[in-house]
């Protein structure tokens, strides 16, 4: 069973270790983390000291997913959009590369949605996925996110997705 806990600085090395090639790195963080390869220090700086580059204080919440069998298995972040505490954004979703395709991402994000809707009481959660990241797009659709729009960007178009509190029956 997947459980969530807040990110700790010691998790940065694990996350950096999953970003094994430039393609995975770009699909995970786009241009937000600079150049590949990434170091644990860069991740920790962004997560622990820079509030995820959010301009609003106390607006960025990185999470770690873990289970009893494998330990730490994934990570993602939550942040409120423009300070609106009714809309939450998920992002920087990554799963241990040795466990991809085993449903870990689905379980992790379902746990995140449960927390978002039941504990935080948000009305909607959004997420973006690059058009070229078919496995992630399918994962997000599987748990109930629906495509809202496609934003034309370089190097890849971005599919904006959302799920509303009343539509979270798959959680």
Identify the residue ranges that each predicted region occupies.
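C-terminal "cap" of GNAT-fold acetyltransferases
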Residues: 88, 123-137, 142-171
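Acetyl-CoA-dependent GNAT
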Residues: 6-10, 17-98, 115, 119, ...
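Extreme N-terminal starter segment of soluble prokaryotic enzymes
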Residues: 1-2
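Residues that form or flank phosphate/diphosphate-binding pockets in enzymes
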Residues: 73, 85, 103, 135, ...
């Amino acid at each position: 069973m997947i459980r969530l806990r807040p990110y700790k600085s010691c998790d940065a090395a694990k996350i950096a270790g999953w970003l094994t090639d430039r393609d995975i790195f770009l699909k995970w963080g786009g241009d937000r983390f600079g150049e590949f390869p990434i170091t644990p220090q860069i991740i920790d700086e962004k997560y622990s000291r820079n509030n995820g580059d959010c301009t609003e204080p106390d607006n960025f919440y990185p999470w770690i997913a873990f289970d009893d069998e494998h330990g730490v298995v994934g990570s993602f972040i939550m942040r409120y959009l423009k300070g609106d505490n009714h809309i939450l954004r998920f992002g920087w979703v990554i799963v241990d590369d040795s466990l991809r395709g085993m449903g870990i991402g689905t379980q992790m994000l379902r746990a995140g949605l449960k927390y978002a809707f039941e504990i935080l009481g948000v009305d909607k959660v959004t997420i973006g996925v690059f058009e070229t990241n078919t496995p992630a797009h399918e994962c997000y659709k599987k748990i109930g996110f629906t495509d809202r729009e496609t934003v034309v960007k370089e190097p890849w178009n971005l599919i904006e997705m959302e799920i509303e509190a009343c539509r979270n029956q798959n959680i």
